[in-house]
Amino acid sequence: MPRPFFHKLIFSSTIQEKRLRVPDKFVSKFKDELSVAVALTVPDGHVWRVGLRKADNKIWFQDGWQEFVDRYSIRIGYLLIFRYEGNSAFSVYIFNLSHSEINYHSTGLMDSAHNHFKRARLFEDLEDEDAEVIFPSSVYPSPLPESTVPANKGYASSAIQTLFTGPVKAEEPTPTPKIPKKRGRKKKNADPEEINSSAPRDDDPENRSKFYESASARKRTVTAEERERAINAAKTFEPTNPFFRVVLRPSYLYRGCIMYLPSGFAEKYLSGISGFIKVQLAEKQWPVRCLYKAGRAKFSQGWYEFTLENNLGEGDVCVFELLRTRDFVLKVTAFRVNEYV
């Protein structure tokens, strides 16, 4: 008889609230079986009693949950798999930021490199961070002696990558705010993250001219038909990983520019990102600064260099695909307007 599973990705709110919400779909099926507390059994043999809080047809792991989190050093970005054994008992498997199952005997701080998921779609994407999947227990990978584990060949070793089984289709991002045209005024209360050392000085026409030179050079006379062909070609490409599409505008192509990313994608996958990520085209990677703030994410430093070196211009469509490797990587597939002229 198949056993039900659900997974939870740990967010900052999970840590702050010191509790974990049980997925609604699981609750709707099994709430009558759950008592006032559950037993969480981890592969090291420890059994943790965690109290449940029930309200408005919702259930949280609460009393005792923080002690469980502390014991295994569970952090933001960790992935927890809960296999329901019946009678308010769960088997719990914990995967860390390097996508490996943790070493339960060292409080989760060390990798257990050989305990990886095989590349398989074990999860379904559900709304509100909830997921519930029912599979035979033989599908679920259990800890094995190192000598019995096959070599890591022919499949991705990223456990979390298997979580991303469906695309995120996003509309064209919010236009980049225009640069102020007035001279001699300093922007008050400016967000320090908006400041870029490569931006032009308003009181220097020569600098301002050079600032837009690169964008002008790549500004094309693109007909609506040509643009539509590139967009339609991009729409036929749907990676299995989460992705979004961006149609490049001149405002995304000058030195010092900022490009905002679709909010739906940002909220789901970029929350907490503040620093350099890797953007990959073909076999080469470029460092690009990505900042998430108040539900929005943007590219700044490094983005211009990426577009310049790859000769990306107005009207080109970029499909950004999230690869969950050890580093945070967005793989780019470019559909160029000049290929459809």
Swiss-Prot record:
Basic residues bias spans:
179-188
Q: Source taxonomy lineage?
A: Eukaryota, Viridiplantae, Streptophyta, Embryophyta, Tracheophyta
Name used for this protein in its record: B3 domain-containing transcription factor VRN1
Q: Which GO terms are recorded in the biological process aspect for this UniProt protein?
A: regulation of flower development; vernalization response
Residues of the signal peptide: none
Primary role? Essential protein. Involved in the regulation of vernalization. Acts as a transcriptional repressor of FLC, a major target of the vernalization pathway. Binds DNA in vitro in a non-sequence-specific manner.
Where it sits in the cell: the answer is: Nucleus
Provide the phenotype resulting from gene inactivation. Reduced vernalization response.
Q: Which GO terms describe its molecular function?
A: DNA binding; transcription cis-regulatory region binding
* Principal subcellular localisation of the protein: nucleus
- Sorted alphabetically, which Pfam families does this protein's record hold? B3
* SMART domains xrefs: B3
One Gene Ontology cellular component term attached to this UniProt record is:
nucleoplasm
Region (Disordered) location? 166-223
Composition skew (Basic and acidic residues), residue ranges: 200-211
Keywords (alphabetical) are:
DNA-binding, Nucleus, Repeat, Transcription, Transcription regulation
Any other comment in the entry?
A: Lethal when expressed constitutively.
Tissue specificity is:
Expressed in roots and at lower levels in aerial parts.
The UniProt annotation gives the DNA-binding region as 5-98, 244-338
Top-level taxon of origin: Eukaryota
Checking InterPro entries in the record gives: B3_DNA-bd, DNA-bd_pseudobarrel_sf, Plant_B3_domain
